[in-house]
């Protein structure tokens, strides 16, 4: 059951103030009047169903709950969003969920999460849905890296200073390989299963890890085009997975450019979708509220369940 919540200029959560585990300190500002924070629920039945899953996870465990939030630079930076993720990881004793969706922005020379880090060699070219002259296609994560060299060696590793017990045992690569002549090789002997599809490759490991090394290599002289749209780090353990998707400068139309959005969102099957976009729309001199609301409505329609899904 999917729940859809639009948040235009901010989203503050006090529900999880129960926990004392904070990855960052934060300031209290007098000019923020939290009495005006309000959640408007349009479908109380769905909302109650979502809260019921949260309740069961809190008390008993065993639930698979996926929350995905879309935003701009505040989400790409991953400081605030990782705080939410850290809360979800530590607020209940049963939560073993992994990182979730991730784009390695270092590959395209942009700022990346300080919590799941990457190093790499090999040259890549970057594209973002927020840059008008960056051509498509784009996927769920709003960015794309195209491999220029014939090989690239990438390591992904958890920053243990800020993320305790952050492990994964499955990695999904969201890709497009125009000539099907590139190989993704996970450099470990603990692979138990590999699933290869046209635009997705999944690797299941025999044990939980907090780092992995990957070799992407072209296998023929024909160049073709290898595009990486992002990854999903998941775990067989149950719990709340908080996926954060952010691109510097992203506006509402930016995500409407992502033609692989719906194909790739099935990978996480979200229970709750949060749109935290709008600031980059509103400050433009050409801003029109009618266009803004129309674009937002289109986003909501794209991500709303079909009538058939409503009956499930």
Please state what every model-predicted region is.
Residues 18-55:
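Sec-dependent signal peptide cleavage junction
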Residues 61-65:
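A short, charged/proline- and glycine-enriched loop
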């Amino acid at each position: 059951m999917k729940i859809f919540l639009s948040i235009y200029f901010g989203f503050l959560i006090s529900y999880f103030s129960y926990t004392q585990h904070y990855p960052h300190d934060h300031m209290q500002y007098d000019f923020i009047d939290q009495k005006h924070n309000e959640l408007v629920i349009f479908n109380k039945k769905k909302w109650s169903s979502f809260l019921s899953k949260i309740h069961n996870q809190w008390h008993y465990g065993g639930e698979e709950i996926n929350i995905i939030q879309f935003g701009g630079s505040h989400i790409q930076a991953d400081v605030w969003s990782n705080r939410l993720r850290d809360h979800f990881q530590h607020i209940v004793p049963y939560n073993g969920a992994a990182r979730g969706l991730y784009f390695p922005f270092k590959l395209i020379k942009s700022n990346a999460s300080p919590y799941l880090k990457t190093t790499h060699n090999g040259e890549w070219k970057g594209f973002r849905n927020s840059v008008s002259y960056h051509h498509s296609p784009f996927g769920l994560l709003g960015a794309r890296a195209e491999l220029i060299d014939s090989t690239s060696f990438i390591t992904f590793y958890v920053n243990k200073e800020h993320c305790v017990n952050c492990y994964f045992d499955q990695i999904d690569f969201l890709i497009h390989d125009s000539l099907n002549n590139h190989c993704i090789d996970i450099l470990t002997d603990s692979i138990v299963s590999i699933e290869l599809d046209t635009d997705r490759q999944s690797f299941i490991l025999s044990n939980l890890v907090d780092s992995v090394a990957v070799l992407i290599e072209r296998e023929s002289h024909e160049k073709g085009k290898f595009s990486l749209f992002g990854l999903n780090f998941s775990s067989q353990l149950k719990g709340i997975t908080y996926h954060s998707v952010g691109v510097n400068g992203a506006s509402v139309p930016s995500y409407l450019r992502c033609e692989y959005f719906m194909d790739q969102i099935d990978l996480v099957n979200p229970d709750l979708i949060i749109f935290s976009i709008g600031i980059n729309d509103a400050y433009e001199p050409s801003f029109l509220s009618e266009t803004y609301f129309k674009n937002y409505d289109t986003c909501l329609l794209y991500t709303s369940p079909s009538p058939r899904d409503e009956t499930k």
